[in-house]
A protein has these predicted regions:
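Glycan-recognition and catalytic cores of secretory/periplasmic carbohydrate-active enzymes
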Residues: 1-179
Length: 179
């Protein structure tokens, strides 16, 4: 899990971020959910390891990973004002993969790369090719509550782990927005 995480700040971006995860340890594509989300699982697993084995030789690495993701949540938490909701994810122009995308019927078809890029570029620019999207890139599905809740759950988990009121407030704001 940690091998697929951006632990250092991306100082080449307009908003230097760190802590987000990639789809794999090869770090070719940043992890982004478009309809459902399991984004909390990395924080949950690492938090459980820290709680259950705080003296393990790898515990400092687990903690550093959790701290990096907490920094990511804090860093993106003020970007959608006045709502205070967390943006969906960082997307890269020309970098998507549709092979595992389920779609309803042949008449719908898959989105084109041009459609994908247009949506990506409608995000908050980080650099020429990277954008932070307020909402997920919409293929066929719409809505983003599951994505917001995945991030909220991760923020609650890390708030408990670090006894961090700011993270707890970020998580609470996500639930308030949905309710």
């Amino acid at each position: 899990v940690m091998a697929g995480q951006q632990l250092e700040k991306r100082t080449d971006w307009k908003i230097p971020l760190r802590g987000f995860f990639y789809e794999s340890s090869r770090k070719k594509r940043i992890l982004a959910y478009y309809h459902q989300s399991q984004e909390h699982l990395m924080a949950e697993g690492l938090s459980m390891l820290l709680t259950d084995a705080p003296t393990h030789p790898d515990a400092p690495l687990w903690k550093a990973s959790c701290e990096a993701y907490a920094d990511y949540l804090r860093g993106i938490s003020q970007l959608i004002e006045p709502y205070g909701i967390l943006p969906s994810a960082v997307y890269e122009v020309d970098n998507t993969d549709y092979k595992n995308l389920y779609h309803e019927g042949e008449q719908v078809g898959l989105p084109s790369l041009e459609e994908y890029n247009a949506q990506v570029r409608n995000g908050i620019p980080l650099s020429k090719d990277f954008y932070l999207r307020r909402f997920p890139v919409a293929y066929q599905f719409r809505g983003f509550h599951a994505i917001v809740m995945g991030k909220a759950k991760a923020a609650f988990i890390l708030a408990r782990l670090f006894n961090d009121k700011a993270l707890r407030d970020i998580a609470t704001r996500q639930v308030e927005y949905i309710l």
